Amino acid sequence: MPGMSRHNQSVGAYGERCALRHLITAGLRPVARNWRCPHGEIDIIAWDGPVLAICEVKTRRTDTFGTPTAAVTGTKARRLRLLAARWLAETGTRADEVRFDVLSIRLTGGPPHVEHLKGAF
């Protein structure tokens, strides 16, 4: 990830692993992680029953720069919609319903706190 320090990349990767464990425990079936194309990246793609969940993971150690969920701006939401359409087209996957979720991971000491906001946008 250009522009990110190695430490921030490590924190982000740890947060994504926490999010993945949370999703699996909640019964979702992951089908892709860190899917990339020239226009961006989708953190996690998973089936929640018949619904395809496009998951953005935001990890924070403090709220100094805002909450993890607040980091998903309108611009980011629009980009994720475009990326999801591209992933569906490239993989030939059919989904009657696509949902956009945000997983907020807070690392403030002790076990990670995971908040899963389904249908965030």
Curated annotation (Swiss-Prot):
<dbReference type="Pfam" id="PF02021">
    <property type="entry name" value="UPF0102"/>
</dbReference>
<dbReference type="InterPro" id="IPR003509">
    <property type="entry name" value="UPF0102_YraN-like"/>
</dbReference>
<dbReference type="InterPro" id="IPR011856">
    <property type="entry name" value="tRNA_endonuc-like_dom_sf"/>
</dbReference>
<dbReference type="GO" id="GO:0003676">
    <property type="term" value="F:nucleic acid binding"/>
</dbReference>
<comment type="similarity">
    <text>Belongs to the UPF0102 family.</text>
</comment>
<protein>
    <recommendedName>
        <fullName>UPF0102 protein Strop_1320</fullName>
    </recommendedName>
</protein>
<dbReference type="InterPro" id="IPR011335">
    <property type="entry name" value="Restrct_endonuc-II-like"/>
</dbReference>
